């Protein structure tokens, strides 16, 4: 019988290799699932299927996993390396798969009694043939059901490129023996648990059935909240209920997605072609976090940072290829143009207007639609920044969508809701040229199909893309920890805890996005070149600086989620030089090679520097203080950092609390000393003159930030009663003049939003009294600290400009 099965598998192998592509999830199970291939592995499959076995085995061999067709030999005993939990629909039946599996489990458990070093790993594996969830109004089952031989043949032809082999987290048999003993009941329990796992996995891979759009509309229009809003609309505008209902239907039709699985499959092929044309690869990290939440039945809300319009497509593509359901995506109404709008809608986009203010009907409908998505179990994605970042930094969060998410949790949401922050990064952003023009004052070009095609046509060889899933926030757990009253019955629409909770969670999302930063070669090369006032370094200096960056990021990690490049500085530089349209040039003279950034590309490069500015801001501040003082006591350095840190924390969403800050600063000092960038003797720090160039380049990371802070505090010293609006305006004007006089290219240097954030942080740190008057002794102390970290030339320009402004206004 065994020989016949082997022959049958060999017959299947040739057509399947032509029809079915290798699509393992995760892409590298040994690393991502932390598998120990030096211990025996047993693959657990849901049901008997020779077709599935051939596909699964081919994936195992390609991934370097043990061959499932071979047996494990333990202490002279040979046992199968795979088991089936159930019978499949097969031409050649053989009874007793369940009993055989229980017997094999028991033999493995018996071996654990006699060998303490043994730890067999059970790995659940399933082959997913297509991922259609089916429609609500149809009785068809999703394509993950048991298929017979004829059905598998058609599935291989139709779904061959859409077939995935899903490897799940290994279960340690040693752990099971220690925790539960090794009697026969444990073997049966293992089989039961594995069956439940496969059932959950099917749901997490397909998601709930797709809705009948018309039936969903009818249900929503009959909801109490929308009926009330329709009545209010009719009264306020003096129109009939019927006319208000038509308006409500029109709004709902404008908002709602119209997901089509066949459309998703088609766009998957297009996106595969697009990524291959534009990027050399998409690096995905920590997707296991999301798969775990999906298996546990969580309602998942993806909250990525927003770099590019392509973010919408990238995250859905990545999730689909990680064995997860692409989410419903909140997209700006500006993307609802022909033909893109209809296509986006079929891929899961639902459209949102820029503002709801004054439109209670729209607000009620949108809120109920979002709540309905949560209720039905669809994952959702929205961009908390509200729009794409033109500077490469995270924008301040817009809290509207988060507020509606918490309202959905309040109102009869039974499944736990987990927010998944997502860091999205690129070595080249498609729209970066447009961003630079907009920052110079050009009008924003309206989105249209021609613009999209022009952008894509021009670009290729853009390096890598990065998607890193940050630490999830389960809302019920967060609220119970920080706002224990949240579950108390309260008939107010917004109880007292609600607004602080929305603000705190939104801020924590931004912090977790930054904790999951993916550092790439462009970020590091750009940071080093922009740190030089002439935007040029010798090749040796640049490589030395890249090495210093790399060592500090490895030895003093910002967080455990940060992803670092694992190539040499030389390889980083060569990679950047090979990218198209970057503006990094090599020039040669009698003394060697100079790496230079073209002047026209300096503003573009600040975008990539700003992506990781939060990682370098503390080392940069330490370097800046030591450089300006030349020699300083550790205590004085720490004191200066504590004064400035709250503003950096607010602006760049840093995660360190006071105790963690002290630890981080000491580690940075130790690392600089280890690299011989500074001298450290007991409580005394000083520059190392032979490495002062490295220290200078490190210090540049906070140069412009401190200059901005100094502008605002100097204005407050001169005009302690100035209004907030006037303070923002005058700070911006002084910064614009400073940028012209001193050649500062950073686009965020005179951005109104960064001044607004700094002034808000001043208020939070009590630099203003209750009547909004400046607390002068505090502001003068801060001004004194800042003035020691800024060049005399800059200080004089700032003071001179402010005095001139006072003369003109008097």
Swiss-Prot record:
Motif (HXXXXD motif): 305-310
Biological process per Gene Ontology, one example term: fatty acid metabolic process
Pathway connected to this protein: Phospholipid metabolism; CDP-diacylglycerol biosynthesis; CDP-diacylglycerol from sn-glycerol 3-phosphate: step 1/3
GO molecular function: glycerol-3-phosphate O-acyltransferase activity
Enzyme Commission (EC) number: 2.3.1.15
Compartment(s) where it occurs, according to its Swiss-Prot or TrEMBL record: Cell inner membrane
Sorted UniProt keywords: Acyltransferase, Cell inner membrane, Cell membrane, Lipid biosynthesis, Lipid metabolism, Membrane, Phospholipid biosynthesis, Phospholipid metabolism, Transferase
Pfam families named among the record's database cross-references: Acyltransferase (PF01553), GPAT_C (PF19277)
Membrane topology, from the record: Peripheral membrane protein
GO cellular component: plasma membrane
Catalytic activity from the UniProt record: sn-glycerol 3-phosphate + an acyl-CoA = a 1-acyl-sn-glycero-3-phosphate + CoA
Annotated domain remarks: The HXXXXD motif is essential for acyltransferase activity and may constitute the binding site for the phosphate moiety of the glycerol-3-phosphate.
Family: Belongs to the GPAT/DAPAT family.
UniProt protein name: Glycerol-3-phosphate acyltransferase
Organism, as annotated: Haemophilus influenzae (strain PittEE)
